[in-house]
């Protein structure tokens, strides 16, 4: 059975009720992982995990817990890359699938934009 991991640090508030309804309807075991309290709602299918505020601590926790075939919702492109390396699936909060075919392009664009911002 698939497990869902939500990178809660940047998950949009407007989508939380929609996500919770889907979790309830599909009865998907879900972990919401963040470095602060994030609440998408109460459900017997949802477990909240608060990690230290160290850089990438939530990401590291997600990667450590996930198994092949699991699904991660994240806007964090480096995390999506790590998820794909573990043969799991990653989508952003709009439902855009990160894949082996497109993740390196997303990473390159992210890195380019970061270097432009730092200039």
Q: Which residue stretches match the model-derived regions?
A:
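Nuclease catalytic cores that cleave nucleic-acid phosphodiester bonds
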Residues: 2-119
């Amino acid at each position: 059975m698939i497990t869902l991991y939500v990178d809660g640090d940047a998950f949009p508030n407007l989508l939380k009720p929609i996500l919770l309804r889907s979790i309830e309807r599909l009865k998907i075991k879900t972990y919401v992982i963040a470095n602060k309290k994030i609440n998408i709602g109460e459900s017997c299918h949802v477990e909240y995990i608060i990690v230290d505020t160290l850089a990438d601590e939530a990401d590291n926790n997600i990667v450590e817990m996930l198994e092949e075939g699991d699904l991660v919702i994240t806007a964090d492109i480096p995390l999506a890359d790590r998820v794909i390396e573990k043969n799991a699936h990653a989508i952003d909060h709009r439902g855009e699938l990160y894949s082996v075919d497109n993740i390196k392009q997303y990473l390159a664009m992210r890195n380019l934009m970061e270097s432009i911002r730092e200039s």
